[in-house]
Amino acid sequence: MRAMRVIMNSMSEISESPPVLDEMVQRITERFSPDKIILFGSRARGDARPDSDIDLLVLFSEVEDPRQRAVELYQSLLDFPRPMDIVVSTTYRFERYRNVVNTVYWPASREGKVLYERAA
């Protein structure tokens, strides 16, 4: 069994029902084994409207085709009745560009909430 750590301490601050996020995180981790899942955008900031989407940055140590992996993630979550935006990248790329303004990594690193992180 692989080691993992799920971070739940900030879930009360997130403007999405925790059971939905818990289920999404569980499904993603079981099927895809990412390094980290970060919620960012309005739901992480706490200013989401009822029609706001769920923005997830899903990081892997390696991923050959990020777009294809994003499609696979979307397909695995089709039964969730929420609009979502899933960005797939590598942990290396996130760490390298997290301080670069106008990248998706910038807001994810500044305001994001880590929902899952694989134990080292």
Language-model features, listed with the residues they occupy:
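Catalytic core of pol beta-like nucleotidyltransferases
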Residues: M1-K36, R45-P50, S61-A120
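Glycine-rich beta-strand-to-loop/alpha-helix junction loops that act as flexible
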Residues: F40-S42
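Short, conserved active-site loops that position catalytic residues or coordinate cofactors/metal ions
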Residues: S52-I54
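Short hydrophobic/aromatic beta-strand micro-patches
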Residues: L57-L59
